[in-house]
Amino acid sequence: MTIPSASKTLVTVYGATGSQGGSVARSLLQNTEFAVRAITRNASSTSAQNLKALGAEVVQADGWNKSQVQEAFSGSWAAFVNTNSEDPMFMSDDGPTEFDLGKIIIDGIVESGSVEHLVYSSAVSTSAFTQGEVTAKAAEMKSRVEKYAMATGYFKSVCPVYAGWYMELFNNTDFARVFGGFPKFPDAEGYLTLSTPRWGAKTDMPVPWVAVEKDFGDIVHGVLLAPERYHGKVIPALSDASSFPQVVDAFQSATGKNVRYVRQAKWDMFGAGIPELEDQRRLFHFGELTNGKYFGDEPTSTTVPAYLKAQAAKAKNKGVDDEAELLTLNQWFRSGFRQ
C-alpha cells in the first residue's frame, strides 16, 4: 500500500449519502488505515446518521459554496466525488450545469491545500467518440469535470471511475415499465419481458452492470490503496458484463420465471415520450455507433474491478469469497427475486 501508515489517513467523500458515495464510505470504514469524512447537504438525515454510527465524521456542506467545500475537504489526503446527474436543476438547457457544480467542487478541493488524490465518478465523452454525432449530456458534463481536474495540475493522481449500469435499476418500478415490465410486471402473455434497443452495432454487445451497494465502494477502495497507479486511467466499475439477452438468461436461471427479451427496432424507441430519458436514448445511439464502447477505449471486462475488489477485501481482512469476488447478475437476481 502507498498510503501513509503513521495514523489514520483521511478520505473525504462528496455525495456520501448517495448510492455511490455511501458504498465508498462503508467500504473504507472497514479498513482501519482509513478515516472517513462524509459530506452531505443534510447532516441530520437517516443516511448521514447511519454513516456516523459506522464511524464516519459527518459534515454538512453545499457543493455550490466553494468556501464550504474548501473547509469540508481540509486536512484530507484523498477525495471521492460524485455529483447527481439527475438533479432536476440540470434538466434545463439554460440553467446551471453539472460541470458548473463540478468545477466549484474541484476548485474548493484544490484550495483546501491538502488533497493529493482525487477519485472522480466520471463517464466517457460521447461526443468525442462519435465525432460530435451523439452528445449525452450527463456523460459529457462528467467528462468535462474530469478533464478540468486533470488540467489543474494540482493532484498527484486523478483517477476517473466510470460506473456501469446499476443492477439496482431492476428494483425500480418506473424503470421496470420502461424496460417492458421486466422484472416486476408480467405482460398479457404471462412473460416478464425485457425490451430495449440493441446495445452494439450489429450484434448484442456486453453491457457493464455494477452492484453499487456491494461492489462499487470496494472498487474505489482498491484504487485508493495505490492511487498513483491509476492516474489518468479509466477504471471500469462493473460487476458483470452481460448483453441484454444474457440478462434475461441470468434471471431465468436464478428464478425459474417465464421471461423473454424483445429487441426494440431503434435506439430512440427507449422510453419514447419521456423527456427525462433523453440521455438514455442518446446512450443507446452511442452504443450503436461505437459497437458498445461504454468505457471508450477501455474494454468492457471485469478484470480490473475484480482485482480492485480483491485488494479491498485483503485490506479489510475479509478474504472470504462473498467479500473478495464481484457479484454476478445471477447471484444478484437470486438474492432479490427468487421466491
Curated annotation (Swiss-Prot):
Keywords: Alkaloid metabolism, NADP, Oxidoreductase
Any single Gene Ontology cellular-component annotation: nucleus
Biotechnology section: Campesine G features good insecticidal activity against the global honeybee pest Galleria mellonella, which supports its future application in the development of biopesticides.
EC number annotated for this UniProt entry: 1.3.1.-
Protein residues bound to NADP(+): K142
One GO MF term attached to the UniProt entry: oxidoreductase activity
A Pfam family the protein falls into: NmrA
Covalent S-S links between cysteines: none
InterPro entries: NAD(P)-bd_dom_sf, NmrA-like, NmrA-like_oxidored
Gene Ontology biological-process entries: alkaloid metabolic process
Residue runs in coiled coils: none
Enzyme class: oxidoreductase
Function in brief: Oxidoreductase; part of the gene cluster that mediates the biosynthesis of campesine G, a dimeric indole piperazine alkaloid that shows good insecticidal activity Galleria mellonella. Within the pathway, cpsB reduces the unstable (S,S)-trypyl-valyl dihydropiperazine (didehydrocampesine A) intermediate to (S, S)-trypyl-valyl-piperazine (campesine A) using two equivalents of NAD(P)H. The non-canonical non-ribosomal peptide synthetase cpsA catalyzes the first steps of the pathway by producing L-tryptophanal and L-valinal from their respective amino-acids.
Protein name per Swiss-Prot or TrEMBL: NmrA-like family domain-containing oxidoreductase cpsB
Organism for this UniProt entry: Aspergillus campestris (strain IBT 28561)
